[in-house]
């Protein structure tokens, strides 16, 4: 999961070795067309009609949700505050975690790699004594907040640091974490 700023960066990267993936091992991936097929479904739903199609699609989405969640957890096991971020905001949060830990503040990060399926499993590893989650993203109101609340079953306070026109600042992330720990930050 990325954003325009990550897409325009010019630093060197190391890519993993190319690997062939057998897409046929998943029943929810694209299947190759047979000769004469055009891939267009005509005349309603095949087989048993819409109920069977809806059940098939429900099972397909469930399998994808289970198998395709992607994230990276950084220092969440003992964190008092855990940032949740993606794209350039996650890079800022990595720096904030480093700075906070140097100051003795237990800050962690869940870096989203996929937005859908939302990586709900990542939140299971959070310290149960965590004081709150800090959504850090370049948006007006925090598009991740509802997903974070759903992933935690609203059992953990969620706070936000949102910036629309500038890259978030690591020092502000640390300051916000300090306010959350002190109990002086307002939930979103």
Where are these regions (language model features)?
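Redox- and metal-dependent alpha/beta enzyme cores, enriched for Fe-S-associated oxidoreductases
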Residues: 70-106, 110, 116-122
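Short acidic, glycine/serine/threonine-rich loops at helix termini
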Residues: 7-15, 95, 122, 145-148, ...
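Short, solvent-exposed amphipathic alpha-helical segments in soluble enzyme
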Residues: 14-18, 95-106, 124-128, 149-154
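Conformationally flexible catalytic loops at phosphate/diphosphate-handling active centers
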Residues: 1-73
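Peripheral docking tails and interdomain loops at the edges
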Residues: 137-188
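Structural signature of the thiamine diphosphate
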Residues: 1-21, 132, 138, 175-188
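Gly/Ser/Thr-rich loops at beta-strand to alpha-helix junctions
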Residues: 5-6, 86-92, 116, 139-143, ...
């Amino acid at each position: 999961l990325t954003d325009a700023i990550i897409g325009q960066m010019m630093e060197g990267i190391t890519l993993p070795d190319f690997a062939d993936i057998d897409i046929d091992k998943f029943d929810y991936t694209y299947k190759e067309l047979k000769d004469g097929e055009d891939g267009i479904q005509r005349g309603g739903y095949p087989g048993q009609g819409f109920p069977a199609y809806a059940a098939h699609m429900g099972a397909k989405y469930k399998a994808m949700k289970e198998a395709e969640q992607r994230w990276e957890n950084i220092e969440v096991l003992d964190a008092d505050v855990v940032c949740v971020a993606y794209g350039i905001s996650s890079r800022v949060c990595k720096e904030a975690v480093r700075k906070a830990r140097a100051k003795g503040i237990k800050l962690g990060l869940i870096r989203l790699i996929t937005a859908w399926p939302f990586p709900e499993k990542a939140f299971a590893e959070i310290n149960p004594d965590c004081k709150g989650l800090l959504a850090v993203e370049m948006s007006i109101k925090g598009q991740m907040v509802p997903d974070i609340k759903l992933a935690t079953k609203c059992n953990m306070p969620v706070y936000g640091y949102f910036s629309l026109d500038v890259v978030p600042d690591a020092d502000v992330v640390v300051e916000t974490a300090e306010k959350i720990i002190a109990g002086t930050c307002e939930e979103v």
